[in-house]
Regions:
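Short S/T/G/P-rich N-terminal loop/turn motif that feeds into the first structured element of a domain
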Residues: 20-246
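Bacterial Sec-dependent N-terminal signal peptides
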Residues: 1-24
């Protein structure tokens, strides 16, 4: 129960250099305000994070404000990178009480999840640590057959392949749910430095990306390899633009 209270998302949203045995995982959750007290919640979360999740004696915690998507107006709190073994350590009574006083007093937590980064699908040339501003594209995987996630991964992988071949000046991290759920999910995380990134309409990818994609894969490949696959094997995409609260 307590571990669920302090569970988190995004994802996911931090990256480190991996060894062959290592993995990058984030535990996260959304925080929905109870009475619209933005400043109180922000101050409370930052206070709690500094005291218990500063990164010196364990994983670091981060807070983002969600600007777009189904959870717009809420916050996303993520801890990571974490290992499964971190969950073996019980939280102290003081830790739990501090969370209750500084966070759950102002917000309801929901959407707890563990997300693991897929290195084969990820393109992260600069090995960024944390994206202060990020676009999170969520793919809801259709259920009923493993072919749905396999085909989506193939489509997402074809994009990563072109990003590598063109030495793209962006990053795109891909995460998958660590535990099987009723509705599986793939998350594509694009860090950005300015909202101007969205003016060309590509929403994360380089402005000339699809031109390069079809040059490499053939005319009509964008629709065939990506568009049709997403339509057939997913239940839609949501786009969440988040900015870090510091």
């Amino acid at each position: 129960m307590i571990k669920k209270i302090l569970g988190m998302f995004i994802p996911i949203i931090t990256c480190i250099t991996l060894s062959a045995q290592d993995y990058v995982m984030f535990q996260s959750q959304y925080l929905e305000l109870r009475n619209g007290e933005h400043s109180a919640l922000q101050a409370g979360v930052l206070k709690h994070n500094k005291k218990y999740h500063g990164g010196s004696n364990g994983p670091k915690a981060y807070l983002w404000y969600v600007h777009t998507g189904p959870n717009a107006g809420q916050y996303n709190w993520a801890l990571g990178p974490v290992k499964f073994s971190h969950m073996d350590k019980a939280l102290s009574a003081a830790h739990i009480k501090d969370w209750e006083n500084n966070v759950s007093k102002y917000a309801r937590s929901h959407g707890h999840t563990f997300m693991i980064r897929d290195e084969n699908l990820t393109y992260n040339p600069q090995n960024e640590i944390v994206g202060e501003n990020i676009l999170v594209k969520r793919f809801k995987v259709k259920q009923g057959s493993p072919i749905h996630v396999q085909e989506l991964e193939k489509a997402i992988g074809s994009i990563a392949d072109v990003l590598r071949k063109t030495n793209a000046k962006i990053a795109r991290r891909v995460y998958k749910t660590a535990f099987r759920q009723k509705v599986g999910e793939l998350q594509l995380v694009y860090p950005f430095s300015s909202w101007e990134r969205f003016e060309d309409g590509t929403q994360g990818l380089p402005a000339d990306f699809w031109e390069s994609y079809e040059k490499i894969n053939g005319r009509g490949s964008q629709q065939k390899n990506v568009g049709d696959i997403i339509e057939k094997h997913s239940n839609g995409i949501t786009n969440e633009v988040m900015t870090m609260v510091k």
